Regions:
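Positively charged, small/polar-rich N-terminal and surface patches that mediate targeting and assembly
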Residues: 1-115
Length: 115
């Protein structure tokens, strides 16, 4: 099966900023995202699970140029004021149209018909 290179951008942040972060991801060119609640420990120590709120892991698969824009925005406007981390992974996807906001959406099956 033919795959295509993309970037997986993962942001872990406090749940209070989830809505603002996901809005920015879309404005920066992400076609969508997935949010998962979580907890853990890091350089700022563990976040007690009995406190209100939680952490969220926000993931989006995007072209390399969009990943770069997202990281630049996080670096310039988020890292200094919010407790969050971000990282990028190389991934391979089957249907690039699902992940590229610049490509027009196609009806189900159209990706197959285009081959």
């Amino acid at each position: 099966m033919r795959t295509h290179p993309m970037k997986l951008v993962t942001v872990v942040a406090e749940s209070e900023v989830e809505h603002r972060l996901t809005e920015e991801l879309l404005l920066l060119g992400a076609a969508g995202f997935t949010v998962v609640e979580g907890r853990g420990a890091g350089t700022r120590h563990a976040r007690p699970s009995d406190l209100p709120g939680s952490n969220v892991r926000i993931e989006t698969v995007v072209p390399a140029a969009v990943a770069e824009r997202i990281l630049e925005r996080l670096s310039e406007h988020w890292f200094a004021d919010y407790s969050l981390i971000a990282y990028v992974s190389d991934v391979q996807v089957v249907r690039t149209r699902k992940y590229d906001a610049q490509q027009p959406s196609t009806p189900t099956g159209a990706d197959h018909a285009a081959r």
